[in-house]
Amino acid sequence: NISSNTITLLHGKGDGAFSIRDEYFVGPSPHLVRINDLNNDGINDLVIPIFGRNFTTILFGDENGSFVNRTILFSGDTPSDVAIDDIDMDGNKDLVVSHFDVNYITVFIGNGNGSFVKKENIDVHGGQHSLLIKDINFDGKLDIVGSLFYDDKIFSLFGSGNGSFYTLNTCNVGKLPSTIALDDFNYDGLYDIAVVCEFDNVISILSGNDDFTFSFGANFIAGNRPAALISADINNDGKIDIA
């Protein structure tokens, strides 16, 4: 809720309906919400990049479905997205934060108790909109894929398995790429990328190459100023769809 600087939680009733609306203050201009267990207590926590400031808010969940403890992670200017996974393979969740108006992403290593230590800023040569963490080169180590909003590119970084990343690769797409999805759209065993290009009103598909880079494949008309997408087998025909 950008105007009220809050997020809203609706509790599911199990029949498709929702009740009990809870609101939590998180900071100016919250951008999105990510969910994961950050402190290894078996309960999901919330991570919210605060686009209007230089921090990310973390709300820790309790056994009642509430979020009672709030902490601030100073994550750098205009945080736009947070990707969560165990990038250093120590069993604890780590964070990678993208920044809309600066040229680097920020890596935070988790201690397993909900606290994080900044490891490094990685220059990706442009402000970013969104991030995903996935093992795109199938070496058992997690990699990063993201969109460079103002530079009209997608970037990828290979992970070393210790929280570090190497070999920045980029691929040109349409204007103002924002949300991305990773999937094997052509069933060749390699990850491909779908990305919303807001200015061009298209979804661009990038095909995965044998060297685990990406090349432009095709554009599909998506309507006026598309802003987000997901990929899944929506109609259960065994083929990946995009919405």
Give the residues covered by each predicted segment.
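Hydrophobic beta-strand segments that make up the repeating blades of beta-propeller
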Residues: 1, 46-49, 95-98, 144-147, ...
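Low-complexity intrinsically disordered segments
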Residues: 5, 53-54, 68, 84, ...
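A short loop-to-beta-strand structural motif that recurs across blades of beta-propeller domains
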Residues: 6-9, 55-58, 104-107, 153-157, ...
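Beta-propeller blade termini
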Residues: 11, 31-38, 60, 80-89, ...
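Blade-edge motifs of beta-propeller repeat domains
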Residues: 11-28, 60-77, 109-126, 158-175, ...
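Glycine-aliphatic tripeptides that mark coil-to-beta-strand junctions in extracellular
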Residues: 42-44, 91-93, 140-142, 189-191, ...
